[in-house]
Amino acid sequence: MAEGPLEAPFWRKGLLVAGLDEAGRGAWAGPIVVGAVVLPPGEYPFRDSKLLSPKARERLAEKVKEVALAFALGVAEAAEVDRLGVLKATLLAAERALLSLPLAPEALVTDYLPLPTPLPLLSPPKADEKSPTVAAASILAKVHRDRIMDELDRLYPGYGFARHKGYGTQEHQEALLALGPSPVHRKRFAPVAQAPLRFPEAP
């Protein structure tokens, strides 16, 4: 962030800026989670969650909650991803996160997510590397989603959700072939669609 954070022009105008980022878009199983964070103007140690160890993410998630003016999470379940597609489900989770914020933001920054909004919006690629609010949102989203996947691992043992968090790995592929898709797998994704059905179909 050598050139200054993305939200700096909004901060200079005195606007409340919400950063949004998601976790789980490319996973084969589990929800998409979007974090929304409003930070006061300043400098922060927050980085893209993908660059952090799980322990560092947990520690920084607590820091985000301490310093944020507001934060919220929105979730789109696997069934909604199947019904709507990845982009629309991500936008739905983002809408839920924004509606859950206790403060109404006056400008938005996202990581290449084209939110339909009347508010001023910056949505460049790799915004989580250039914006502390987006990085903070990515940390909250990732930590929350990891906890969901840990719980799903207990509900649906054998898939390795606690290890791969629902993403495509050889272990996950082999579990799908052996067990078939679980109720929290995304049936639209080819590796899931091609696996033999063992669980009853949801109504």
UniProtKB/Swiss-Prot annotation:
Q: Which residues bind a divalent metal cation?
A: 21-22, 111
UniProt cofactor(s) = Mn(2+); Mg(2+)
Quote the CDD domains the UniProt record gives.
RNase_HII_bacteria_HII_like
Q: Alphabetically list the UniProt keywords.
A: Cytoplasm, Endonuclease, Hydrolase, Manganese, Metal-binding, Nuclease
UniProt cross-references to PROSITE patterns, sorted A to Z: RNASE_H_2
Q: Supply one GO BP term.
A: mismatch repair
Domain RNase H type-2, chain residue ranges per copy: 15-201
Q: Where in the cell is it found?
A: Cytoplasm
Reactions catalysed, as given in the entry: Endonucleolytic cleavage to 5'-phosphomonoester
State the SUPFAM superfamilies in the record. Ribonuclease H-like (SSF53098)
Primary localisation category: cytoplasm
GO function terms (MF aspect): manganese ion binding; RNA binding; RNA-DNA hybrid ribonuclease activity
Q: Which EC class heads this enzyme's classification?
A: hydrolase
In the record's cofactor note, how is the cofactor described as bound? Answer: Manganese or magnesium. Binds 1 divalent metal ion per monomer in the absence of substrate. May bind a second metal ion after substrate binding.
Gene Ontology annotations for the cellular component aspect, listed alphabetically: cytoplasm; ribonuclease H2 complex
Q: What is its EC number?
A: 3.1.26.4
Q: Which PANTHER family match?
A: RIBONUCLEASE H2 SUBUNIT A, RIBONUCLEASE HII
Q: Which family is this protein grouped under?
A: Belongs to the RNase HII family.
Tell me, in a sentence or two, what this protein's role is. Answer: Endonuclease that specifically degrades the RNA of RNA-DNA hybrids.
Q: Which HAMAP family match?
A: RNase_HII_B
Which protein, by its recorded name, is this?
Ribonuclease HII
Which species is listed as the source? Thermus thermophilus (strain ATCC 27634 / DSM 579 / HB8)
Its gene name is rnhB
